[in-house]
């Protein structure tokens, strides 16, 4: 896909960073193909730089229920950033059905199997995303074990957003639609680099 055509609402100075994260997310999603047992591709992608304080409103407000997969990014000595994938609950359930080859609508809640499936999504996407960033930036990066959370957006995002506000009032949001030939799901990636990761 032509990411330059998909990048919107980004200042020219941010194009390289947005393109880097966009390609990384594309790589991460296509990594799900091995889990699904069939090709998973990105259908559309919209990359934006947004104010951190506005992030909960992107998901329906602080009290809206979300499911998030959180991965911390480790580099040379300290944590180099964070990756958070956010879904509406019904979308996350649909992703579980897609990956487990179940009829759409089979999953209606997060039990051990569903939580484990989404955790594996975090493992695969985190690894593929960081492999791309490592190859591109020359930094050795590795993901933490993923954490899967289902709660109100404000509760889930508060601790993560506090980390961002320590050094920036803006961050990157990547809205994606992806899936197989017969099913599609949508999700939002938050790419939260600290200055050392942005510097490459």
Where are these regions (language model features)?
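Composition-driven recognition of glycine/serine/threonine/acidic- and proline-rich low-complexity segments
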Residues: 2-200
